[in-house]
């Protein structure tokens, strides 16, 4: 099925300064990146899903909603695994870890290997190449 546009889809701000997200995890990650930059002031935001297939738009929304709803729980798990406070991590790393952890811990239909791989790819694509090993280690 070809991707279709939907006027009822929720949209956040610009996906990133460089490009629109090409997939659900990128859309969710970009919205979480905006939130991570503002934390602890979490505002109402949603992934930019225009141009994504309906199932990808839905996945982006589910990842984002689960991450924001359980932000503190996921942060505690990430801090325990990474042995460092979330506040010391770059926003792109926090966003990637939150999205990955939400998929692994809260979403039962997402394989762990896919969540880890896509989280590493997200952080690399947003300029965090050096941090990709950290994301991989914490989520595994």
Briefly describe each language-model feature range.
Residues 1-140:
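Class I Rossmann-like S-adenosyl-L-methionine
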């Amino acid at each position: 099925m070809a991707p279709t546009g939907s006027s009822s889809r929720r949209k956040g701000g610009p996906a990133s300064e460089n490009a629109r997200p090409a997939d659900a995890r990128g859309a969710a990650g970009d919205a979480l990146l905006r939130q991570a930059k503002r934390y602890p002031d979490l505002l109402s935001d949603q992934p930019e899903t225009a141009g994504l297939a309906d199932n990808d738009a839905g996945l982006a929304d589910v990842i984002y909603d689960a991450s924001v709803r359980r932000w503190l729980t996921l942060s505690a798990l990430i801090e325990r695994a990474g042995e460092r406070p979330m506040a010391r991590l770059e926003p792109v790393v926090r966003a990637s870890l939150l999205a990955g952890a939400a998929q692994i811990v809260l979403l039962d239909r997402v394989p762990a290997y896919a969540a880890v791989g896509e989280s590493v790819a997200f952080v690399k694509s947003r300029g965090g190449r050096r941090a990709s090993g950290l994301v991989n280690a914490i989520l595994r």
